[in-house]
Amino acid sequence: MARYTGPSWKLSRRLGISLSGTGKELEKRPYAPGPHGPGQRKKLSEYGLQLQEKQKLRHMYGVNERQFRNLFDKAAKMAGKHGENFMILLESRLDNIVYRLGLARTRRQARQLVNHGHVLVDGSRVDIPSYQVKPGQTISLREKSQNLSVVKEAVEVNNFVPEYLTFDAEKLEGSLTRLPERSELPAEINEALIVEFYSR
């Protein structure tokens, strides 16, 4: 399944979450798109709830179905809780770390920065958004990339960096100090439903 490239605001309303992270998509119309307005959402079956939760998480991180399933299977081989490990793997993707550091305003922007070769990991260019960042690794930008308008705008408005990251706003450099805990990951996701979906 290809990555969704349509209007993010419409998808956000359909899934009931803000995919941009700003919450603006749901401010005026916090209901699914369509001609009938609020109050028209059908009650979902158990399968429907599981599918919706999977789609919420997949679109939140901007991952296609193949990558999503591969990470899910990888998480199954790790010690600990399957669903929690899965979310930690998603959170440790390079594009997501760039977003969490505040070098991009959205994950989509962060993915473009990585794809276009602007991002360095331990001083070496990495252009693979799905690259798994390990604790202790340093994330920075190429010198000429530090003046990009999208980066400057993102850094100006960013006022929060998760506790599992460190960030130097002067150097535009940060690192993953440890893997995140479940309490630091998106609370609006019920990963148990996703485990149930793939276990059917």
From Swiss-Prot:
What domain of life does the native source organism fall in?
Bacteria
- CDD domains given for it? S4
A Gene Ontology biological process in which this protein takes part is: ribosomal small subunit biogenesis
One GO MF term: structural constituent of ribosome
Pfam family of the protein (one):
Ribosomal_S4
Report the SMART domains cross-referenced here.
Ribosomal_S4, S4
Instruction: Give each disulfide bond as a residue pair.
Output: none
Keywords, A to Z, come to: Ribonucleoprotein, Ribosomal protein, RNA-binding, rRNA-binding
PROSITE patterns per the UniProt record, alphabetical: RIBOSOMAL_S4, S4
* Domain S4 RNA-binding per the UniProt entry, residue ranges: 92-152
GO cellular component terms, alphabetically, are: small ribosomal subunit
Question: Where are the annotated segments for Disordered?
Answer: 22-42
rRNA-binding keyword on record? yes
Q: Which Gene3D superfamilies match?
A: Ribosomal Protein S4 Delta 41, Chain A, domain 1, RNA-binding S4 domain
- Functional note: One of the primary rRNA binding proteins, it binds directly to 16S rRNA where it nucleates assembly of the body of the 30S subunit.
Do you know which PANTHER family this protein is assigned to? 30S 40S RIBOSOMAL PROTEIN, SMALL RIBOSOMAL SUBUNIT PROTEIN US4M
Q: Which family does it belong to?
A: Belongs to the universal ribosomal protein uS4 family.
Q: How does it assemble?
A: Part of the 30S ribosomal subunit. Contacts protein S5. The interaction surface between S4 and S5 is involved in control of translational fidelity.
Q: What is this protein called?
A: Small ribosomal subunit protein uS4
Q: Which organism is it from?
A: Bacillus licheniformis (strain ATCC 14580 / DSM 13 / JCM 2505 / CCUG 7422 / NBRC 12200 / NCIMB 9375 / NCTC 10341 / NRRL NRS-1264 / Gibson 46)
